[in-house]
């Protein structure tokens, strides 16, 4: 064989191997492009979380810390989101990422500080003395007198015959006067 033929065979081998590499690279890039378009069309991207799925995910992410449905004031970067948006607006109607979920977790409570406060309560604080028996006896005597002689200054309400609205009015009074009974005790 002449040197020309040898050069031609060598050039042909180089060209064949180059074409093989180019076609493999081209095929691989085409395959990746098809996979990317297929996953985008089927919605395999970031998913949204709503309802029970959102609550379960928040419980899993936040653990024992707990979580908020709306951000507490002054917590996290509030400059990019409006004040009335919560986790439902951010994760149910848009895609939701782990970082966004973690922003709604309650702050970490330091367990060591909580334990030391509990320990201080048990060791440093003096116990409160029990109420003396003399005070208890006075209270019991007052109870007996009240039971024997009911207070005659309170007017007794008598239901009017044939009028069923008094009980409704009474219930309304009870409900509307909670917290400010004026010394009267209502029982439901």
UniProtKB/Swiss-Prot annotation:
Comp. bias regions, Basic and acidic residues: 140-153
SUPFAM superfamilies the record matches: Insulin-like (SSF56994)
Single GO biological process annotation from the record: positive regulation of cell population proliferation
GO MF entry, a single one: hormone activity
Protein name: Insulin-like growth factor 1
Region (D): 107-114
Region B, residue ranges: 45-73
Residue segments, region A: 86-106
Propeptide residue intervals: 115-188
InterPro entries reported for this sequence: IGF-I (IPR022341), Insulin-like (IPR016179), Insulin-like_growth_factor (IPR022350), Insulin-like_sf (IPR036438), Insulin_CS (IPR022353), Insulin_family (IPR022352)
Region of interest: C: 74-85
Cell location: Secreted
Keyword terms: Disulfide bond, Growth factor, Secreted, Signal
SMART domains linked to this entry: IlGF
Tissue: All the isoforms are expressed in embryos, juvenile and adult liver, muscle and brain. At least one isoform is expressed in heart, kidney, testes, ovary, adipose tissue and spleen of juvenile salmon.
Pfam families: Insulin
Region feature (Disordered): 115-188
Family under the similarity heading: Belongs to the insulin family.
Disulfide topology: 50-92, 62-105, 91-96
Free-text function comment from the UniProt entry: The insulin-like growth factors, isolated from plasma, are structurally and functionally related to insulin but have a much higher growth-promoting activity. Acts as a ligand for IGF1R. Binds to the alpha subunit of IGF1R, leading to the activation of the intrinsic tyrosine kinase activity which autophosphorylates tyrosine residues in the beta subunit thus initiatiating a cascade of down-stream signaling events leading to activation of the PI3K-AKT/PKB and the Ras-MAPK pathways. Binds to integrins.
Organism name: Oncorhynchus kisutch
GO CC terms, sorted: extracellular space
